């Protein structure tokens, strides 16, 4: 069995409040309707925005879900959006053909969180 070799890492060593590095991370915005998959294919209730992902003071990526009650998030496939969040992807930016991907994450308990 061969020894594992690290070929890429993302440590988020950016100033607090910074957006994730756009040379690595792209954002999907909206509710999926623009991609032909309203609710992103699994009835997600949030609308993805540019404001809900940032680097915190511990150099960690923070993705924040926010409840919206004033209609300021715009419309979702089901009506006025009630939640905003962020959707980050590495599509067309970082590639892996084989191997193992490891991530350390903290996710709170609750409906719709995974």
Q: Where are the regions a protein language model picked out?
A:
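Conserved kinase catalytic-core segment
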Residues: 114
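Low-complexity, Ser/Thr/Pro/Gly-rich disordered linker/stalk regions
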Residues: 1-111
């Amino acid at each position: 069995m061969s020894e594992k070799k690290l070929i890429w890492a993302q440590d988020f060593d950016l100033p607090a409040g910074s957006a994730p590095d756009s040379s690595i991370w792209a954002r999907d915005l909206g509710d999926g309707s623009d991609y032909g998959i309203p609710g992103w294919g699994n009835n997600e209730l949030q609308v993805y925005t540019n404001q809900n992902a940032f680097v915190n003071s511990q150099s960690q990526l923070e993705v924040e879900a926010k409840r919206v009650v004033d209609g300021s998030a715009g419309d979702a496939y089901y009506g006025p959006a009630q939640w905003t969040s962020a959707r980050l992807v590495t599509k067309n930016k970082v590639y892996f053909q084989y191997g193992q991907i490891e991530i350390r994450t903290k996710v709170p308990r609750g409906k719709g969180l995974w």
